[in-house]
A protein has these predicted regions:
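Phosphate-binding site recognition
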Residues: 1-140
Length: 140
């Protein structure tokens, strides 16, 4: 049984906004952020790319070579070629942001690229924005 949360309505509103930006969701541990995002993703997108930086440390190299969306997507595809990146129909979900805060730098470039929606999630205990190399104004 799924317990509907406030975040569910927020995610629906975000999806309806044609000018949506990459989304960072932060909150306490173990409150259902990942479960809510995952449920939303599979109900609304044809393709879901979920990367958990705790469970899959190998993805911490996806910004090698640059933070632009094309480079990040290329590096993800090199690690797991089975994932489908379908423009306009794919959500990229970066979970456990606090373990790889550098990925936040790429969000500006995903916004400019515009082909894919992006949601990041992380715990308040671990997110330290002063550890992020570059902070783009208007994208946090």
């Amino acid at each position: 049984m799924y317990l509907r949360r406030k975040i569910d309505g927020f995610l629906d509103e975000w999806k309806e906004n044609e000018n949506r930006k990459p989304l960072i969701i932060k909150g306490p541990r173990q409150v259902g952020k990942t479960e809510s995002i995952r449920r939303f993703a599979y109900e609304n997108y044809e393709s879901v790319i979920e990367i958990n930086f705790v469970l899959s440390e190998k993805y911490r190299m996806i910004t090698d070579g640059g933070y632009d969306a094309s480079n990040v997507i290329k590096n993800i595809s090199l690690i797991d070629p089975s994932w489908d990146f379908i423009p306009g129909k794919t959500l990229i979900f970066f979970d456990e942001l606090q373990e790889f805060p550098e990925i936040a730098t790429s969000l500006k470039f995903f916004r400019q690229d515009g082909r894919f929606d992006v949601i990041c999630s992380g715990s308040l205990l671990g997110i330290s924005y002063n550890r992020i190399e570059s902070n783009s104004v208007g994208y946090k």
